[in-house]
A protein has these predicted regions:
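Aromatic- and charge-enriched surface segment that lines or borders ligand/interaction sites
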Residues: 1-36, 67, 213, 409
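Gly/Pro-rich hinge or "lid" segments in bacterial periplasmic/extracellular proteins
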Residues: 70-74, 81-147, 151
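Structural transition elements
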Residues: 240-286, 304-310, 405
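Long beta-strand-rich cores associated with HINT superfamily self-processing modules
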Residues: 437-465
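Surface-exposed binding/hinge segments that line
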Residues: 14, 28-99
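Ligand/substrate-recognition segments at binding pockets and active sites
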Residues: 129, 273-363, 373, 435
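Ligand-site clamp/hinge motif
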Residues: 110, 140-185
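Extracytoplasmic/peripheral linker and loop segments enriched in polar/acidic and small residues
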Residues: 233-236, 273, 327-342, 368-442, ...
Length: 465
């Protein structure tokens, strides 16, 4: 139930779904809900203004029953994966409508304590914007007997040195470590490590009219083979990655087999993590000759964090050293993450919006075939202008074809999608990040380390004095 005592039932779910797809609200996650692990009948058409709500495959039957009509058949796992997406987080109709503006294009819901109502394992007790949010245990939560904490206090602290000071003073119980802080605590037994569900990669704007060489496959391959991933990862305390599918992505959950464990996954790996300086120089020479250039200068945009500065500066130094400083120069431009997202996605209206940047999509660990949606032609928030008919075809087959459940079919399709991205260097994978946390001794985890799709389960931990 909601914290005010109102029942949370199918009506709330139905209203949530309708608001996700509302054409006027233009929710950025609408496409994730309309067509992701499952494709809902006419959902995307409704969002784009090409169908009525009555045509959408979402039906409210009664207070406890909903029907979802999909374009193709799906198994229960696919449906559960789809409904576990953050786009399905329940919203309260009364509060959502109370915060709506006059033309129904925006709502203030979720922007302050007065504009929000809780229903989960914890309830908002105090909310000070840009400072802290205090939660208390929800006694009416269906699984309240599994919640040991009396509450949670989240502090908003941007400066990493201040975060560490709060931890050392005993004012917070866990903190995520930056690279520099991790180096100081690397041998501390309180450190928790786990692979991150994402591969950081260089994003290439292949349609930039001011830098046509970015459309040259040999040039992109030169950048790919010219990345010394092992040394970079050693510097930034990550794992080198010449692949796109992270090590966390499972092909067979029952057998605990990841894609990278399979023969197909191993076949997409390269020696020395893809670093081949001689091949890179040869490809660079051929590409720059084909484009009629004597020297090339590119700009890389990156988010203004310690890690991304380190990674960008590494490439700024290593690529000119490899290709020749008199022939290649990489300029860097830092900016806030939200501004960077706008710049990257700006290629759709301004093809010259950027040249090189960074990406790192987080996909579903249990459905690696679905995680490739970010590179399909129909994904609405694409970072780069990669549009490939063959890629779309393989993606649709892996996610919707009748034979996708047959032995080995999806495995081959995942391998093929990864190959279509990496072989022509449409994206340039560099590292797979590692979660780095420092945990107070009094905080006892309910898990034996990091668990796929659950993490460290902080909400289910205990305080043991």
């Amino acid at each position: 139930m909601w914290e005010n005592g109102d029942t949370l039932d199918a009506n709330d779910v139905y209203y949530t779904w309708k608001m996700i797809l509302d054409p006027k609200l233009a929710n950025l996650r609408a496409s994730n809900f309309a067509n992701d692990a499952i494709e809902i009948v006419k959902a995307m058409d409704y969002f784009q203004g090409n169908a009525s709500w009555d045509e959408v495959g979402l039906k409210l039957i009664d207070d406890h029953t909903l029907e979802i009509h999909t374009v193709s058949m799906h198994n229960p796992t696919e449906v559960m994966i789809h409904l576990a997406h953050p786009a399905n987080c329940m919203i309260n109709e009364e509060y959502y409508e109370k915060g709506m503006n006059a033309d129904r294009t925006e709502t203030m819901y979720g922007t302050s304590q007065e504009q929000y109502i809780s229903c989960g394992p914890f309830l908002v007790e105090n909310w000070v914007n840009d400072a802290e949010i205090t939660f208390k245990k929800n006694p009416n939560y269906p699984f309240a007997d599994r919640i040991w904490l009396a509450g949670i206090n989240i502090k908003v602290v941007e400066d990493s040195s201040t975060q560490m000071q709060l931890f050392e003073n005993g004012e917070i119980d866990y903190v995520q470590l930056s690279t520099s802080n991790y180096l100081k605590y690397e041998e501390d037994p309180r450190v928790l490590l786990a692979p991150y569900n994402s591969v950081r990669h260089v994003v290439v704007n292949t349609i930039n009219p001011e830098k046509p060489i970015l459309a040259n496959e040999k040039f992109r391959q030169a950048l790919y083979y010219g990345v010394d991933r092992e040394n970079l990862a050693s510097l930034t305390k990550q794992d080198p990655a010449e692949y796109i599918v992270p090590t966390t992505h499972m092909m067979d959950l029952n057998k605990n087999i990841t894609f990278r464990d399979t023969e197909e996954g191993k076949a997409n790996r390269k020696e020395n993590y893809g670093y081949d300086p001689e091949k890179a120089k040869q490809l660079f020479d051929e590409a720059i000759s084909e484009e009629g250039l004597d020297k090339l200068t590119l700009t890389m945009h990156y988010s203004d964090t310690e890690l991304m500065a380190q990674m960008s500066e590494f490439l700024q130094q290593s690529w000119p050293k490899l290709f020749g400083a008199d022939r290649f120069e990489l300029k860097l431009q830092a900016m806030p993450a939200n501004q960077l997202s706008q710049v990257k996605r700006g290629w759709q209206t301004n093809p010259a919006s950027y040249e090189l940047s960074w990406g790192g999509w987080v996909g579903n660990d249990l459905a690696p075939w679905n995680a490739f949606k970010y590179w399909t032609s129909f994904y609405s928030n694409k970072n780069e202008p990669f549009i490939n008919e063959e890629f779309d075809k393989v993606f649709n087959a892996a996610n919707f074809a009748d034979d996708r459940f047959d032995e080995g079919v999806r495995l081959k399709e995942v391998a093929e999608m990864e190959r279509l991205l990496i072989e022509p260097a449409n994206v340039i994978p560099v590292t797979q990040d590692i979660y780095k946390y420092l945990k107070a001794d009094r905080l006892q985890l309910s898990t034996n380390g990091y668990v796929n799709r659950i993490g460290f389960a902080w909400d289910y931990s205990k305080i043991v004095e």
